[in-house]
């Protein structure tokens, strides 16, 4: 399946919630009719079956993190192999992706922008350039914006935008040096309450 390159608003409208796919300069509801699905009959949202609810939740989270179906399934398989709550572990794996950590640290305004920054070799992990967006960041790892990228206006804008987001206890960021440390594993209590990971587990468990 190819990566979606169309209007970001359409994805958020499809899921009926803000997927944080845009920079946040303007509230999504200023342009996007969040309560209306895209399409000619979008005003009438069909009542979903249990399977439909599970599928929509999976699609919502997959689109939120910008991950293709096959890769998302692999994260579920890995989470199910580990001890503990499978749903919480799944979100921990997604949050620990390098592109997401770069976004959470405020070095990019969106996850898509963070992915591009990583792919274009603008990010170092523990002093070494890493251009793999899916690379797993571990507790104690130091993520730094490379010198050649620090002057990019989009990064400076992202840092300013990040000041208005809630600080997370599991990362520590120095906005002057554009360097951050992942202090611990992502904390589920600090992640979106709008995600019902149990529905995803039920979908894949069938």
Curated annotation (Swiss-Prot):
The protein's matches in PROSITE patterns, at most eight in alphabetical order, are given as: RIBOSOMAL_S4, S4
The record describes the protein's role as:
One of the primary rRNA binding proteins, it binds directly to 16S rRNA where it nucleates assembly of the body of the 30S subunit.
Q: How does this chain assemble?
A: Part of the 30S ribosomal subunit. Contacts protein S5. The interaction surface between S4 and S5 is involved in control of translational fidelity.
Give the UniProt record's GO annotations in the biological process aspect.
ribosomal small subunit biogenesis; translation
User: What UniProt keywords apply to this chain's record, in alphabetical order?
Assistant: Ribonucleoprotein, Ribosomal protein, RNA-binding, rRNA-binding
GO CC terms: small ribosomal subunit
Q: Tell me which species this is from.
A: Francisella tularensis subsp. tularensis (strain WY96-3418)
- The reply on keyword Hydrolase is no
Q: Which GO terms describe its molecular function?
A: rRNA binding; structural constituent of ribosome
Output this protein's name: Small ribosomal subunit protein uS4
């Amino acid at each position: 399946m190819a990566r979606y390159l169309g209007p970001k608003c359409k994805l958020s409208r499809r899921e009926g919630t803000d997927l944080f796919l845009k920079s946040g300069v303007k509230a999504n509801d200023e342009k996007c009719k969040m309560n209306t699905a895209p399409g000619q009959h979008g005003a009438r949202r069909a009542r979903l079956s249990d399977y439909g609810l599970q599928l929509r939740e999976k699609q919502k989270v997959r689109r939120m993190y910008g991950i293709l179906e096959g890769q998302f399934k692999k994260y579920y398989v890995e989470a199910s192999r580990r001890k503990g709550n499978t749903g919480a572990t799944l979100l921990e794996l997604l949050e620990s992706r390098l592109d997401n950590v770069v976004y959470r640290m405020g070095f990019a305004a969106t996850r898509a922008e963070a992915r591009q920054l990583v792919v274009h070799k603008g990010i170092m992990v523990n002093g070494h350039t890493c251009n793999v967006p899916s690379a797993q960041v571990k507790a104690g790892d130091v993520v730094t914006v490379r010198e050649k990228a620090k002057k990019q206006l989009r990064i400076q804008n992202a840092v300013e935008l990040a000041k208005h987001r809630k600080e997370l206890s599991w990362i520590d960021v120095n906005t002057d040096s554009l360097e951050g440390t992942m202090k611990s594993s992502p904390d589920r209590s600090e992640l979106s309450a709008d995600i019902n990971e149990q529905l995803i587990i039920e979908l894949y468990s069938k």
